[in-house]
Design a protein with these regions (language model features):
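N-terminal first-folded block
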Residues: 2-39
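Glycine-rich beta-strand-turn "strand-cap" elements at beta-sheet edges
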Residues: 41-46, 76-100
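Short flexible/disordered coil segments
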Residues: 3, 7, 69, 94-100
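Localized chelating/binding microdomains
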Residues: 23, 52, 100
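Generic "edge-of-domain/loop-turn" microfeature
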Residues: 13-15, 45, 61, 95-96
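An amphipathic, aromatic/His-enriched active-site/gating alpha helix that lines ligand/cofactor pockets
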Residues: 24-36, 55-89
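Short, well-ordered beta-strand segments in beta-rich or mixed alpha/beta enzyme
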Residues: 2-9, 39-66
Length: 100
């Protein structure tokens, strides 16, 4: 299993149009075969910061995700916005277990 943790900075005035693109991206990505979880969330303490959490079955599922039409549509939608990924890191993990 792969876990991707990413962070993006959205400029002032770009959050509303970015959120429309993000909602479509989350819905389409969660429907992909091999996607276990896919979520964006706004940081509560840092204005304009969005955290992205993804869980994929394997490398093939993640690679397939980057080739989807909705990934291309998302790139086009945010292309004109002040939206930049600050970091994105992929982790290899086992199935995990409850923390509590």
């Amino acid at each position: 299993m792969l876990i991707v943790l990413a962070k993006a900075q959205v400029g002032e005035g770009a959050m509303e149009p970015a959120m429309a693109a993000i909602k479509a991206m989350v819905a389409a990505s969660n429907a992909e075969e091999g996607c276990i979880a896919y979520a964006f969330t706004q940081d509560l303490l840092q204005p304009g910061v969005i955290h992205i959490v993804e869980k994929w079955k394997d490398e093939a599922a993640l690679a397939s995700h980057f080739a989807t039409p909705h990934m291309a549509a998302f790139g086009a939608a945010i292309g004109g916005l002040d939206f930049k990924v600050i970091e994105a890191v992929k982790y290899h993990a086992d199935e995990g277990s409850p923390v509590m």
